[in-house]
């Protein structure tokens, strides 16, 4: 049972023959010009539709649907909770209490993911929810000097602090509406990002250490992540505001780097990385939060048999037809046209290229964040 559960988390390996796997790998590993099954460029995402504030009774919500029919809905709810300090913090005195209460805590953000065909405690939803939650609570803003960053000092954890005795608790519920046709991480991360952008909290009317009292008028509610005017968003000044992180799925096939991979592309990938990034409000560019490696499902595929080793083909082929060549990306000897499951690791230069493509000025990461910034959340 445990082996089945572990295998089910490996991005749903499609049933492809060794010949199909070899064809896909050869097409995707062409130097500098990979041919993707759907005709996209290496850095191109699937077309999508996005909308926000679709769920009544939530503080924020969003829906994103890809062109292949997969959709996800995210709802964010917030409630006021009394801050419980540990005995060690209380024993440290007033100064320790102030530090612990104002910096926030990662446990104040809870995330749950529901995927059709998976139990709540299966490896895939648990891994995805914890990975996205860690990037959310791990994005810390240094200082708070300009723009909307005064409210976001300390990142999301600091934003949830009301005073020393009270704080907000966030519940982020993610629902994948259809069976995952590929690894669902990009869809879930983009939808969560958009839902958090649309999340509002009631305006606080109480002051200091008083029990929290809020304004009943929802029109004056404040965004969880402060937003600027449309003029600032279109002129590129929105980068001074803190934004939720996004986690991008990146694969390498040979020396090529491919974003938003499909199910078939993941099946032949040499390496699969989940890269979490956010805006660095001080430097004006992107900041790397975390990198997670995902076990490539290509390791679970069945190898092909060269004609020279096939009993049914003895005498039917020339002895020099199956000559092994060295794969420059993996350093392994392979027979052209014969599929071999990926083994070993990946070159450091390939990993560095994957990170550079995400973080560089005008790169994929900036394009994704700018596209999400343009979605209307009013």
What is each PLM-predicted segment?
Residues 1-378:
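Polyanion-binding surfaces on beta-sheet-dominated domains and ring/shell assemblies
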């Amino acid at each position: 049972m445990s082996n089945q559960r572990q295998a089910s988390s490996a991005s749903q390996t499609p049933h492809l023959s060794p010949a199909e796997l070899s064809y896909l790998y050869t097409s995707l590993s062409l130097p500098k010009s990979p041919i993707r099954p759907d005709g996209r460029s290496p850095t191109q995402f699937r077309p999508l539709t996005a909308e926000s504030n679709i769920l009544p009774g939530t503080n924020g919500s969003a829906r994103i649907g890809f062109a292949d029919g997969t959709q996800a809905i995210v709802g964010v709810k917030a409630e006021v909770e009394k801050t419980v300090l540990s005995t060690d913090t209380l024993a440290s005195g007033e100064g320790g209490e102030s530090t612990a209460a104002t910096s926030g805590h990662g446990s104040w953000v809870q995330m749950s993911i529901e995927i059709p065909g998976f139990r709540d405690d299966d490896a895939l939803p648990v891994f995805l929810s914890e990975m996205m939650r860690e990037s959310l609570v791990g994005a810390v803003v240094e200082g708070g000097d300009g723009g909307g960053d005064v409210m976001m000092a300390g990142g999301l954890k600091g934003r949830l602090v009301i005073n020393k005795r009270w704080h907000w608790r966030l519940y982020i519920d993610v629902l994948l509406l259809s069976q995952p046709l590929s690894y669902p991480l990009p869809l879930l991360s983009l939808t969560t990002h958009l839902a958090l952008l649309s999340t509002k909290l009631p305006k606080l009317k109480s002051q200091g250490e008083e029990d929290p009292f809020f304004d009943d008028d929802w029109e004056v509610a404040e965004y969880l992540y402060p937003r600027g005017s449309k003029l600032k968003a279109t002129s590129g000044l929105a980068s001074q505001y803190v934004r939720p992180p996004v986690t991008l799925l990146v694969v390498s096939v040979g020396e090529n780097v491919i974003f938003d991979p499909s199910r078939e592309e993941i099946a032949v990938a040499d390496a699969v990385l989940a890269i979490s990034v956010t805006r660095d409000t001080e430097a004006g560019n992107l900041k790397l939060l975390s990198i997670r490696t995902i076990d490539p499902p290509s390791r679970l595929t069945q190898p092909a048999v060269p004609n020279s080793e096939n009993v049914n083909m003895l005498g039917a082929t020339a002895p020099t037809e199956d000559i092994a060549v060295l794969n420059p990306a993996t350093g392994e000897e392979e027979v052209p046209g014969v599929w071999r499951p990926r083994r070993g690791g990946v070159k450091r230069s390939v990993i560095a290229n994957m990170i550079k493509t995400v973080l560089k000025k005008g790169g994929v990461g900036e394009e994704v964040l700018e596209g999400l910034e343009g979605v209307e959340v009013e």
